[in-house]
């Protein structure tokens, strides 16, 4: 039976995301699971525009942006040791991790 575990990571800070990806890759390599990735997924860019003045001057606006960086890691036939190590993985705040089998 061929199983694969998809690990999707999202974060606003790409450095935190890359550190977490490196940790997962190290866990996978040390436990002997076959790994595909990390695959960089498209970055979602959201732009917010607000008025600078509360009353007039609609032409005076300020723009802010928020970028959501994403990565995908695929483990093929994950070993039980790999699954246990991933359960114990401490993920920093600001990184969202989703597992799919």
Swiss-Prot record:
GO terms for molecular function: structural constituent of ribosome; tRNA binding. The keyword Metal-binding does not apply. One of its GO terms (biological process) is translation. Keywords: Ribonucleoprotein, Ribosomal protein. InterPro entries: Ribosomal_uS10, Ribosomal_uS10_dom, Ribosomal_uS10_dom_sf. Transmembrane segments: none annotated. It comes from the Bacteria. Signal peptide: none annotated. GO terms for cellular component: ribonucleoprotein complex; ribosome. The keyword rRNA processing does not apply. Involved in the binding of tRNA to the ribosomes. PANTHER family: 30S RIBOSOMAL PROTEIN S10 FAMILY MEMBER. Part of the 30S ribosomal subunit. Belongs to the universal ribosomal protein uS10 family. This is Small ribosomal subunit protein uS10. It comes from Ureaplasma urealyticum serovar 10 (strain ATCC 33699 / Western).
């Amino acid at each position: 039976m061929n199983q694969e575990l998809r690990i999707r990571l999202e974060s606003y800070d790409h450095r935190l995301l890359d550190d977490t990806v490196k940790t997962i890759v190290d866990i996978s390599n040390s436990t002997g699971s076959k790994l595909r990735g990390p695959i960089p997924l498209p970055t979602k860019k959201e732009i917010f525009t607000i008025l600078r003045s509360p009353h007039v001057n609609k032409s005076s606006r300020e723009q802010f942006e928020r970028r959501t960086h994403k990565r995908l890691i695929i483990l093929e036939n994950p070993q039980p040791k790999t699954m246990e190590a991933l359960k114990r993985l401490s993920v920093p705040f600001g990184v969202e991790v989703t597992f799919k089998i």
